UniProtKB/Swiss-Prot annotation:
Coiled-coil ranges from the UniProt annotation: none
Basic and acidic residues bias (residue ranges): 88-98
Residue stretches making up the Chromo domain: 7-67
GO molecular function: histone H3K27me3 reader activity; histone H3K9me2/3 reader activity; methylated histone binding
Record text on subunit structure and interactions: Interacts (via chromo domain) with histone H3K9me3.
Domain of life: Eukaryota
Region (Disordered): 66-177
Keywords tagged on the record: Nucleus
Protein name (Swiss-Prot/TrEMBL): Chromodomain Y-like protein 2
InterPro entries per record: Chromo-like_dom_sf (IPR016197), Chromo/chromo_shadow_dom (IPR000953), Chromo_domain (IPR023780), Chromodomain_CS (IPR023779), ClpP/crotonase-like_dom_sf (IPR029045), ECH/Chromodomain_protein (IPR051053), Enoyl-CoA_hydra/iso (IPR001753), Enoyl-CoA_hydra_C (IPR014748)
Sequence ranges of Polar residues compositional bias: 130-140
CDD domains: CD_CDY, crotonase-like
Amino acid sequence: MASGDLYEVERIVDKRKNKKGKWEYLIRWKGYGSTEDTWEPEHHLLHCEEFIDEFNGLHLSKDKRVKSGKQAGASKLLRDARGLPVERLSHRPLEPGKSKPSSHKRKRVNSPLSRPKKGSSGKAPDRATKTVSYRTTPSGLQIMPLKKAQNGLENGDAGSEKDESHFGNGSHQPDLELNDQLGEQEASDCDGTHSALVENGVGSALTNGGLNLHSPVKRKLETEKDYVFDKRLRYSVRQNESNCRFRDIVVRKEEGFTHILLSSQTSDNNALTPEIMKEVRRALCNAATDDSKLLLLSAVGSVFCSGLDYSYLIGRLSSDRRKESTRIAEAIRDFVKAFIQFKKPIVVAINGPALGLGASILPLCDIVWASEKAWFQTPYATIRLTPAGCSSYTFPQILGVALANEMLFCGRKLTAQEACSRGLVSQVFWPTTFSQEVMLRVKEMASCSAVVLEESKCLVRSFLKSVLEEVNEKECVMLKQLWSSSKGLDSLFSYLQDKIYEV
C-alpha cells in the first residue's frame, strides 16, 4: 500500500500475542474480504478505541488507557504508516480474483493506543494473513511520521527496519546491560536530529514499558558505535562557532586528546601559508584551554607538510615587498611560538615527506612517530632562505653539528630510519598499520593523569623555552630582512622560476 493512503476499519476479528509478548489485532478492512485481513500491533490503532472495546466486551479498565477527545458518530481513521514493503506469509494461496488493498484508493482509519485486557485470548486464526513492517517511536505511543529523508541515512535506521521486518520471529531478546541503557538514555538528550537517530535504532516498546533492544551482542556493538558518533556530534554542537570554522585544517575532539590534521584546501601538499598557520595557532590555543590531556598532529594525504608555500611567497612579495615580508615573517614567528609555549604534550604522526618548516617544528614537539614512507629535508640554503622553526638551534643539538649543517646547507634528505637513529624521530612504524599504532599509543597516553603529563613536560622543556623563543625571534628577523632586500628576493625568485621551468 502507498504510505499516504488511508483505509477504514470495519471491525476487529481476533487478537493474539506475538512471540515478544505484545498484543496484535486482526483487522477487517471495510470493502475487503476476509483474505485481506491483517494483523496490526496495538500501538497502530490510534482513535479506534471503540472497536477494541467492542471486541473485548467493554471490560477494559480506564487506568490502562488514556481517553482522547472524540466526536460521537464520527468515522474512525487509521493512518497507514507502512513505510516498508508488505510481505505476505500465507498458510493458503489467495483467491485469484482478489487484488491487494494497495490497488484501492480507499481511506483507512487512525486509532489511538489502547491496552487490551490481560486475560483475553491470544490465539491466531488459521487463515490467510500478512505481516506488515512499521516504523515506530521507542515509546510505542504513536506512529513515526513517514519522513525518511531526515533519518534514512543515519546509523540504526537500517537495523530497525530489518528487525521490524522480522517481527515475531523470536530471535531477539529484550535483556540488555546497564551501560547500554545508560548510553541510549544519554544519546536521547541530543538535538532533534540525533535523538531521531537513536529512536530509530532502538525499536518498539515492550508491554511492560521497557525497550526492545534486540540481540544483546549485536545491540551492544551498535550502541557503542552510535555512542561514539553521537558524542562527537554533541561536542561539535556545543563548541563555539568560531572554533569550528577551519578551512585548511581538521580539528577533532577525541576522548582525552585533541587531534589536528593538516588538510589544506588552498595549497598543494599541505604547504603552509600565513592563513593556515593562523588556523593551527587557534587550534593550539583551544586545545591548551580545554580538557584535552595532549595534542595529536597529523596530516591528510600522502605528504605531511611541504613547508612554506613558495608560490604564495612569490605572489605576495611581488605586490608589496616590505609590508608582506613583515606580515609573513610575523606569521611564522607566531606559529613557531605557539608550539614553544604549548604546555601539554604534542605528539606528531608523520605519514609522509616533511620538508622545510614542516620538518623544522618537529624538535619543538615531544613525541614524533613516523611511517616508513616518511622522509625529512630542510633545503633552506638551496631555496635561498635562512633556517626557520628554531632548526638553527635544535638540529645541531639533536642531530649533531655535522649532519645538521648538511641538512640546512646542502638539503640532505633523511629517511625515517635515519631520522630515528639520530633522535629526530621517536619510532618508525610500518605504513599499513601506522594509523592504528599511533592511535593505540595516543589513547594509552590519554589515560594518564593530565597533571602528570603537563608537569613532566614542564620539567623537560622549561629551561629550553626562553632559548627557543630567542632563536625564533632572530630567525624571523633574518627572514624579514632577506625578503625586504631586492637581492634576497631576486635570488628567491630566480630559484623558484628555475624550478617551475624544470617541472
